[in-house]
A protein has these predicted regions:
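Extracellular/virion structural assembly segments
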Residues: 1-148
Length: 148
């Protein structure tokens, strides 16, 4: 891992896209068939107001450290780094959730995590998103890439 994306300057707007390779075909009778490849990744596009050279320098230097597409890094957009819900406390996974699961039993929270919130488990590099509001059972996408 090549570090974390600079937190300053802050982007004016951010677009997050989920990329999930899917094969889709049509039969001769026009029935649609779809198959998932099982992978997923996020792409993020950030737009900045015009910056001076000094303001842009941390972003430029970080981009160069990545050596094109070689580097891997983390990025927490300020607007998305906290839940949009009322959850407080420490999320504890009850365990026994396997790769491929998309429903995760947990406890330790008071309040609610909201659909669209992002979550990362301590033992994972992968970031997941909640597909519904949650208090004790998290519905996530993509499904777990490895056990938690």
């Amino acid at each position: 891992m090549s570090g974390a994306y600079p937190t300053t300057p802050v982007a004016d707007s951010i677009k997050i896209t989920s990329i999930t390779p899917t094969l889709v075909s049509l039969t001769h009778s026009l029935k649609r068939q779809a198959r998932s490849r099982g992978g997923q990744r996020w792409t993020i596009s950030a737009t900045y107001a015009p910056l001076s050279r000094a303001e842009f320098a941390p972003i430029w230097a970080f981009a160069q450290q990545q050596r094109g597409q070689y580097g891997i890094f983390t990025y927490q957009p300020p607007i998305y780094k906290d839940t949009s819900g009322t959850a407080t406390g420490t999320l504890l996974v009850n365990g026994g959730d396997s790769a491929g699961d998309s429903s995760i039993a947990c406890d330790g929270l008071t309040g609610t995590l909201k659909a669209g919130d992002f979550i990362k488990f301590a033992s994972h590099d992968k970031v997941y998103t909640l597909t519904s509001d949650a208090t004790t059972t998290l519905a996530i996408e993509p499904p777990l890439m490895s056990a938690v």
